[in-house]
Structures are given as C-alpha cells and as structure tokens.
Amino acid sequence: MNRIASYLRTYATEAERPMATDVQPSESDVERLLRQRNVGISAHIDSGKTTLTERVLYYTGRIKDIHEVRGRDEVGAKMDSMELEREKGITIQSAATYCNWKATPPTERSNMTGDAADESTVTTQKKHDYHINIIDTPGHVDFTIEVERALRVLDGAVLVLCAVSGVQSQTMTVDRQMRRYSVPRLSFINKMDRAGANPWRVVEQIRTKLRMPAAAMQVPIGAEDNFQGLVDLVRWKAVYNEGTKGNVVRESDDIPADVLELAREKRQELIEQLSDVDDEMAEIFIEEREPTIEELVAALRRATVACRFSPVFLGTAIKNKGVQALLDGMCAYLPNPMEVRAIANDTAVAKKIAAQANEEGHDVAAMQSSAQHGSEVQLVPATEAPLVGLAFKLEESRFGQLTYMRVYQGILRRGGIIFNSRTGKKVKVPRLVRMHADDMEDVQEIGPGEICAMFGVECSSGDTFTDGSTTLSMSAMFVPEPVISLSLTPEGKDTSVNFSRALNRFQKEDPTFRVHVDSESSETIISGMGELHLDIYVERMRREYNVPCTTGKPRVAFRETISQPAKFNYTHKKQTGGAGQFGRVIGYIEPMTVDEDTGKDTAFVNSVMGGNIPPSYIPACEKGFADGLEKGALAGYPVCGVRMVLEDGAAHSVDSSELAFRIAAHAAFREAFRAANPTILEPKMSVEVIAPVEFQGTVIGALNQRKGTIEDTEVREDDFTITAEVSLNDMFGFSSQLRGLTQGKGEFSMEYKKHEPVMPNVQADMEAAYKKSLEKK
C-alpha cells in the first residue's frame, strides 16, 4: 500500500509536460498497473524470438503444450498463425497475446526446491501475479513496419540475440527503433547450447555496436552442448531447469567451483557498469561498499526504465533453459504503464498557437514547430479520465476489419461511441476482444495501459480515438519509404474485382506496401521494403483471393534531389479569349533533411506577406509543388529532400485562378530544380553475409565485384561474418550466386541504409535513356 500511495503522490509532480486531465489514477488503477507489463520481443531473423515466446506462453500456462516453428510437428508455433509463416519458418505479421505470471522478486531470498518428476513450476514462499501483454514481431527487415508499430505502443522490450552470431544487421535496426520511441529493453542471449556460443563477446557487442551500457545478470554453468544452468548474479544462486520441458526450476546456494571465480568477476562487472549510469550505485562503488540485493535491484530498475542500461539474461529457448528467469526479469526491471510518459497533442491548443504565430508574422516552419511542442500534454492512465487510444495495426479477418488498439487513458467499452480525431467521425464499437495470436476472447471493456482489438471500426493505422470530450491526438509512427518495386498483372479472366480488393486491403494493413498505376505503361506497380516483402503479398493474393499474378522485373526506387538552393520568379500567363490564366510566384527551393517530428523530407512553406497572393490560392501553389515532386527533371523519378519557400507573387483580379497558380508553382519548381544542381539517388543497402570460414575470400570477391564497400569482418572458429554497403541495384541475383559459391552453406540479409548519389557516368546514362524515352512519345 505504501508503494501505491507513493505513486499517487508523485505521478503529477514528476510530469515533464502539462497533464491531459486533472484526474489522477485511483488506488485500484495503481494497484492493477503496478502488476502489468506491455512487452515486445524483437530480434534479427532466426534468433529465436517465436521459440522464446512459445516457451513464455507454455510456462505461464497460456498454452498446454510446446510446438516448434516451421510446423515440424504439423502444428507450428502458436504465434505463427499464418500458413505462410509455418511453411517458411519466419514471422511475417506481429502477433499479440497475453498471459499471467507469478514472478519471484529478485529480493526474494528463499530457495526453490522440488521433485524433478513433478512437471509443474515449483512455488516459493512469496510470488506476485503479473499480467503481461506480449507482441511477437518479425525479424526479417522486409517486415520492419511490424516492429515499428509494435514498439510505438509498448512500454518495454526484450531484444533477443544469438549467442553465436551476436549483434547482426536487423539487431541494429531494432535498436534504432527502440531508441526512436524510448523503449527500455532487456537483452536475452539465446542459443547458449550451440557450438561456438560466446555470451561475453555478445555483451561487448551490445556495448560497442549498439552503444548501450549492458552487463550479464547471469553466468552459464557448462558450455555449448553441456550447458546445464545459470548462476544468478543478483541473488547469488545456481539455477537449474529440470523436467522434460524445463518446468521445474531448482535453486541452490552452492555455486559450482569451476564457475565461482568467473561469477565473482562478472558480478563486480555488473556493479561497475551500473555505477557508470546510476548516481546512487556510483556512490556505493566509490565508498567501496558491497551493495545489498535491494540496492542492486533498485539501481537496475532505475537505469533500465530510464533507457540507460540493458540487463542481459542468458538461456536457450529450444532447450527450455533460462526462460523463467527472463520472465521474472520482465516483471522486475521493465516499466509498468505509469512509468512511461505517453504524450499527445491538443489540436485546439496547436491551432491557437499557430494562429497567434501567424498574426505576429513568424516563420511558418518555426510556427509549426512551436505549435507541435507547445500543445503537448502527458496522458494519465486513469479509468476516470477521458478516453484516448491509438489504433496501431489493422488486419482483415473472417469477421471484418480488426483494429488493434492501445488504450492510454480512460475506458474503451463494447457498444460505446468513440471519435476518430483525424476524421472527426464518431463510430460505435460493436465488438471488443483480447487477442491470443489468431484466437480471441470477447471482453466488455478495456482500461488504461491495456492492448485490445476492435471489430467493425473503419480507420487507418495511426488514428487516435477519444470519447469526444477532448481534442487530443497522438503522433503517428515512423513509416520508412519503399526501396523496391515491380509490376503486377493478374492472370485469367474475372479477377479484377478480387485483385483490387486485395490491393486495397494490403495497403490498409501495411503502410510500407504502396500501389500505383504507371501513367506511361498503365501497369499496376507495387512497392515495398524488399523482394521477400513483395513476394509474400503476391503469394497471399493467390491463396487468399484466388488471384494468381505475373510479376515483372524488380525495379529500384531511385530518387532525385538537389544539392544547393535556387531562386524562382515565374509568371504563368495564358490568354485564349475571355477570361485567361495568370499567376506569378516568387521564392526559392533548398535542400532539406528529414524532419524528426513529421518524418518527412519535403515541405512547402508559405512566407507570403501583404497578400500579393490571395490566401485562397496558397493551397493551389502547394498542389503545384506536390505535382513537381512526382517526377524529377533528370530521369522522371520522385523528388525528395526539397523545401519550397513561397515568398511573393502577383495575382490578377479576373484571370487568376487556382489552376493558374497550380501550373505556375509546378513550372517554377521544375525551373528552379534544374538550377539547383540536381542529382539522382540510389538506395544503399547494409549487407551481412555469414558463411563457413573457408569461403571468406570468395565471398569478399563477390561483394567487390558488385562494387560493395566492406565495412566490418569478424572471423570465428568455423564461420565468418562480413558487413558491406552495396547498391540495391547491384544486389539482384546475389542469393543464387552465394549459394553456388558456398555450396549452399552461406546466408545473407540486407536492409536499407540510405539513399546516395549514383556515379556521374551512371547518372549521365540514366538521363540519356530518359530523354530518349520522351522523344519516342
């Protein structure tokens, strides 16, 4: 009760921003939220995320038996519910579930004892019941949006790493995503039973490659295929999983002699690492005093919740070892929903700030930034507060559209009326469910801090829902731009309806899946994050909609941009008898980097003073700018990284119109674009290759042949890892080449890194080819 009272006293006083409501969490809110965790499990592909989640569900009693990925037992892992996921052995869509866990507090000193023949988890004198919402995310970079939107709504995460491979390319992507949303994380080094497992190398990689202070919470007893158990460095006990499925957890005060010295060394290392990021632990370290278990646990929790430290747990999910300790760690060190500061924008306040700034003649970009930050409020996880929830994922089910929702404050009720803050529309919630992969459980209401799903609510991913009493809106998630495209043609007759239906559904579900019709060839073009990403959607179209398709050759997502500012002063004048067309625009364009608040790298800024261009024509000028972004002047690729600033102009009382100013702005943009030293950009990929060490020279030669730049090489006893930067345009066909070079033993992954200018000779060829294609028309 003292802890509850403490939360009630300090919740409002610790707020960094104005509170969204005067209502505070009640005692029952605090009591419930203290025992709740919202956790995502993320990692590089094949690190064992889904296998780990399967064990978590089994040990918490959520499922009755353990099944493996790839459907080896003709059942498949619970969280891989799609047929394609079970066939390919990869997670394609993030899957949500929930479970309850009786956690042993790290400060609990009593031993666990039990009969190994008893297949139930052994109890202790004191345990606490925790409710855990879990989202299992894909590891393949092509499905990175699934990780993005999961981390947007979660309070904590488990970053799974392979004990052999360590930090890999997608690990670094997930790390960036966790930092983007300030998500505290535990690290779990999986596959400790594999040959070549080296947890200390992986811990060092977390510190150096991910730049995250970290230390092991455990020391392994035995190595590789002789991996037997773990030494808990906080509670100073030897821990063993026994029973056929690791259900029985046995603890002992006797630390094996062969690991005793290492355990002492690693415990001291844990304290030293913590003292670098926690002031209270630093004082204890300076005093050369041994911290108590309570002091150590408190410091671990403070540093983890503040995203300054990552506790590292060890285990092997496939061999059922170390999972229960990780569950205890989730409950002990990851934040509850009250410890995460959820921020929303009050749109009414934002409009007032923007209007005031406009009246005072401030720069438009500064005005927008001021309105964004000045309207921020902190949401309160109280049931009595006005409802605020975020729709973070859409999915089509046999019952209609399924909308996943995180409730931040207030209560969402079945049959209740909610308002979409983006559209202003009100909708009724016909059905409310908790998800367990593809199964669901109907509920009547969901409180703050919970994750649920709604049926029959039309919306878009990233929409905010309220009860209509507030003008709050939460920021949407970051959506990366597609890097690859291909043409798609449905086979057979009478497939056009299902073809359109499938494309519309896939676009609603996945913001990184884009569709457009090529204006020149009239082909349907789909764009996405990689070849596998698009292949999955083509296959889903065949299976789910009975629409087999023919695909064209993949196309790289080239872009055009500028490298210096350029002014424009353009007049569009046309007289054809009667009312003509007149519009004059003056201003400049300049290079622009990605805006951290909006995630966009193009912007139109209205700096017109004095009304030389009537305000009613400004939106038409912005549309003209948008028209210019669609096709660059060099090779017809979309334009990025440009800000257009409109400073002045002129209008005619009779001949001016929206169309005239739209044409004028478009022509002015194209004219200035040519004068701004434009260049063509191509996507550069971070490529990671793992293969047996005897093929190292051959693989490096293949990457050099594709004009790759080797960035890092790590050689182990049996295999090696090479990281290189290669143009996506040079990576087609590498998969089959690598199989041939390594006798099928090599594997690679790649992820988008950045867009960079193409070589001058390549740009000249692309410009010539584009000019030639225009001449043929």
From Swiss-Prot:
It comes from Malassezia globosa (strain ATCC MYA-4612 / CBS 7966) (Dandruff-associated fungus). One of its GO terms (molecular function) is GTP binding. One of its GO terms (biological process) is mitochondrial translational elongation. It is found in: Mitochondrion. Keywords: Elongation factor, GTP-binding, Mitochondrion, Nucleotide-binding, Protein biosynthesis. The gene is MEF1. Mitochondrial GTPase that catalyzes the GTP-dependent ribosomal translocation step during translation elongation. During this step, the ribosome changes from the pre-translocational (PRE) to the post-translocational (POST) state as the newly formed A-site-bound peptidyl-tRNA and P-site-bound deacylated tRNA move to the P and E sites, respectively. Catalyzes the coordinated movement of the two tRNA molecules, the mRNA and conformational changes in the ribosome. Residues 34-338 form the tr-type G domain. NCBIfam families: EF-G, small_GTP. InterPro entries: EFG_II (IPR041095), EFG_III (IPR009022), EFG_III/V (IPR035647), EFG_IV (IPR047872), EFG_V-like (IPR000640), EFTu-like_2 (IPR004161), G_TR_CS (IPR031157), P-loop_NTPase (IPR027417). The keyword GTP-binding applies. GO terms for cellular component: mitochondrion. It comes from the Eukaryota. SMART domains: EFG_C, EFG_IV. Belongs to the TRAFAC class translation factor GTPase superfamily. Classic translation factor GTPase family. EF-G/EF-2 subfamily. This protein may be expected to contain an N-terminal transit peptide but none has been predicted. This is Elongation factor G, mitochondrial. Disulfide bonds: none annotated. Pathway: Protein biosynthesis; polypeptide chain elongation. PANTHER family: ELONGATION FACTOR G, MITOCHONDRIAL.
